[in-house]
A protein has these predicted regions:
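A conserved short beta-strand
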Residues: 40-56
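Short, small-residue-biased leader/transition segments that mark boundaries at the very start
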Residues: 2-9
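Conserved alpha/beta-hydrolase fold motif
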Residues: 22-23, 45
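The feature captures the conserved acid-bearing segment of alpha/beta-hydrolase catalytic domains
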Residues: 52-127, 132
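Histidine-bearing beta->alpha loop at or near hydrolase active sites
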Residues: 137-147
Length: 172
């Protein structure tokens, strides 16, 4: 398995700053899973609409076809995946993500990513982990785009994140 310069950089960053919480967004979600697997300094992950997920070998869900291409989980050795079960993980998804197949490219793209995210959370928890997926509209937080951190209500989302950090002892 290739370990490129980006992987080395992330591991070195956590070695330099010490233990911390990793916040990822979109395609960076995949890099976050790999960073946590390879960096014991990662104490938890907050992932905003991650784009790709890892699963233990032999447990990768079926591919999910969509208008924007096929969503595929990525297999990692079980011992690597199990490192994700040792830290709290929370995923956030905003509005405008349909439950059913649609002809809208953006909605379809995130529909399959949300569905795969649910399977990722199930896999982490099935292996003894602590993962949560929050669909913001379902908890009354509305109006969010894919860029949750820059939307007008980002302070409300930050408050939710802060509460999660406290609940998991990650605010110290």
């Amino acid at each position: 398995r290739s370990r490129g310069l980006g992987d080395v950089y992330k591991r070195q960053l956590f070695k330099r700053v010490g233990k911390g919480i990793l916040v990822t967004h979109s395609a960076g979600g995949f890099l976050g899973w790999l960073t946590a697997i390879r960096s014991p300094e990662v104490r938890g992950i907050i992932s905003l609409e991650p784009g790709t997920y890892v699963f233990p070998e032999g447990e990768v869900p079926e591919d999910m076809p969509s208008l924007t291409g096929t969503m595929k989980g990525i297999a990692v050795p079980p011992e690597e995946f199990n490192k994700l079960t040792q830290i709290p993980i929370i995923l956030y998804f905003g509005d405008y993500i349909p439950e059913n197949v649609t002809d809208k490219l953006g909605g379809e793209n995130w529909r399959v990513r949300l569905q795969m995210g649910r399977k990722f959370v199930e896999a982490v928890n099935r292996h003894g982990g602590n993962a949560v997926l929050v669909e913001l509209p379902k908890i009354g937080i509305r109006g969010n785009t894919h860029f949750l951190m820059s939307d007008k209500n980002n302070n409300i989302i930050a408050g939710h994140m802060a509460a999660w950090l406290r609940q998991n002892g990650l605010d110290r």
